[in-house]
Design a protein with these regions (language model features):
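Conserved core of the sugar-phosphate nucleotidyltransferase
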Residues: 2-18, 25-103, 126
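Left-handed beta-helix
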Residues: 5, 16, 30, 41-43, ...
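A generic "binding-loop/recognition-motif" signal
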Residues: 21-22, 138
Length: 299
């Protein structure tokens, strides 16, 4: 984590805690970081962005007449709301990188927000020439990975000219018995077997599917997650590509006694038919990591 290391090296000693978001990557080409205000107790690093990219995240709204001044912040902002402030404010997306002095950190556990505002000064520091890549949702994972693949735009740095952009098709540790075509987009296949009778659309993420000979047709936006449970059972989940699930709001998994029943349950879920399979909340699922590792080695 070069950026985190740079922040630690260049941060004044009065700051004792660095908080970092685990579902994001910040790419920057600047080695020397911006100076930190000498009177600040809490530092929030941000990146300049456009309303579309900032949608769904915490956004600092900076006064357009004085971009160094934080006017207010919006939690989980939507693009339309941000566009309403275009003439008066510049959106600065919160990177999730925050610095705290020891006193401010200790006070957070005992004080209200109003008390913190009165006792401590918060400064928002923009990271110049930086880009924020979020991996918090399925859609963001695919989009950020594609953008990182195409990060080099300067043709002088590309050995072969006129190369097409990297497509949004990602396969890792997978066996695919049928080719992906130009009609497929936003496809992510990991630790899975796609048999010859499978048919994919776009906005499909498929993970953990064991070796099979099923006849599966996925509609646009349908995603599959399969996990091994116990000695022989599998848990399968059908979820939506565009839905931003949280750790406490995961879709339910359906328990199957073996791989044969797994295929039948999966077909029923895709067709929208009821199943007799027992369901369990995703956050309560106990995965057999040994079987998961064995399956990965097969692929």
């Amino acid at each position: 984590y070069p950026l985190l290391e740079r922040i630690i090296r260049q941060t004044p000693e009065r700051f004792t805690l660095l908080e970092a978001e685990s579902t994001a990557y910040i790419h920057t080409t600047i080695y020397q970081l911006p100076e930190i205000p000498s009177d600040a107790d809490i530092i929030c690093y941000g990146v300049w962005t456009d309303p579309f990219a900032a949608a769904g995240h915490r956004v600092f709204m900076m006064d357009r007449r004085n971009p160094a001044h934080l006017d207010f912040a919006i939690e989980h902002a939507d693009a339309e709301t941000l566009r309403q402030y275009v003439s008066t404010h510049i959106p600065l997306m919160d990177t999730g990188l925050h610095l705290f002095t020891e006193e401010a950190h200790k006070a957070m556990a005992h004080c209200s927000i109003d008390t913190l505002k009165q006792r401590f000064k918060v400064a928002v520091v923009p990271l110049t020439k930086a880009t924020y890549y979020s991996f918090a949702t399925t859609e963001e994972m695919v989009r950020s990975t594609m953008n990182l693949q195409n990060i080099v735009q300067d043709q002088r740095l590309i050995l072969q000219s006129n190369l097409p952009k990297h497509p949004s098709l990602f396969t890792q540790n997978a066996i695919i018995d049928r080719p992906l075509t130009a009609e497929n987009g936003n496809i992510w296949i990991e630790n899975a077997h796609i048999a010859r009778n499978w048919s994919l659309s776009h906005d499909n993420v498929i993970t953990g599917v064991p070796e099979n000979d099923w006849d599966i047709t996925l509609k646009a936006g349908q995603c599959i997650s399969v996990l091994p449970v116990g000695a022989e059972r599998y848990a399968v989940c059908l979820y939506d590509f565009a839905t931003p699930y949280t750790a406490t709001d995961l879709p339910a998994y359906h328990l199957c006694p073996d791989a044969t029943q797994l295929g039948k349950v999966l077909k029923a879920l895709i067709a929208g038919c009821p199943t007799e399979a027992q369901t369990i909340e995703g956050c309560k699922l106990e995965v057999n990591t040994e079987r998961l590792t064995e399956q990965r080695l097969k692929f």
